[in-house]
Structure formats: C-alpha cells, structure tokens
C-alpha cells in the first residue's frame, strides 16, 4: 500500500497485504479485498460502501480527474474484473473479466456477465443483466441477494491464509 495517510479501511474490513491501494480510498465496514486487487485513486478518490467483495486481480481505477468514484453496498467484483465506472450502486455482480468502462454508471441489482462490458457513458437501469458476446441486455425479475454467507466465510478463512493490512477506522467526518 502506498500513501497510507489517504487510505481509510474500516475495522471489520479484511484487506490482504498483496492488494495495492493508491490515492484516497475509503473502504467502509464489512468488505473483503482479496490478494492482488488494485485500487487506483491517483486521479480521484474512491469511496467504497459496506459488505463488498473484491476478488483476486480485480482492478478498481478512478480515471476521472478529481471526481469521486462511488461504489455502493454488497457488490461482488469477480476475478480479473475491471471497473472505471463513476458510480456502481448496490447488490451488483461484476463477472469474471467483465469491464465497466470510464464514466459509465451501474444502478442496483445488475449482473454483468463474464467478459461483458458496460461501455463509456452508458447508464444501466436497475436490475439489468448484461450477457453474451454481444453484450445483450435484459431486465431481470428478481433482485440480487446480499452475499452474507460468502462474506462470513471469507472473513473467517482469509486471515488464516493471508497477512492483512493494519486498519484505521473510518470516521463519521469522512
């Protein structure tokens, strides 16, 4: 981790030391950050809500000059996913090798399939599934669930096999 004075990690959040965090990043309660995840906030801050899962090699990069990237609660960023979106709501699943391009916005309860893209400046409405090689869209009928059991399991198992970052509690002023 570089520039730790601008990084705030809540006490109940698990961040493996192999993760890379640059710039102003605030990660709230209950998140799990796997090894080799990259948070790059060198161009603007990244604010992460509660109970998100960032799997191995996920890249979260704010490419907007000075504008914050906001990630809501209970999202899953799967292995090798990339996110440069300006906003990601809550309860979204970003699939393996999926890519949220610069400036796009993802609402709540969306599912982005493996290797799918949400293109620059595109705004997804709630409950949209993006799937297939042509990035087809459809509205889903059921909302995504909060990954409670997965979070509980990861919070127990990751500390047994990985070193974790020391954390600073997120204060109310932030």
Curated annotation (Swiss-Prot):
Entry keyword annotation includes Cytoplasm: yes
Gene Ontology molecular-function annotations: dynein complex binding
InterPro entries the UniProt entry points to: DCTN6, Trimer_LpxA-like_sf
A biological-process GO annotation: mitotic spindle organization
Entry's Gene Ontology cellular component terms: cytoplasm; dynactin complex
Localization in the cell: Cytoplasm, Cytoskeleton
Function text: Part of the dynactin complex that activates the molecular motor dynein for ultra-processive transport along microtubules.
Similarity-based family: Belongs to the dynactin subunits 5/6 family. Dynactin subunit 6 subfamily.
Protein name: Dynactin subunit 6
Species name: Caenorhabditis briggsae
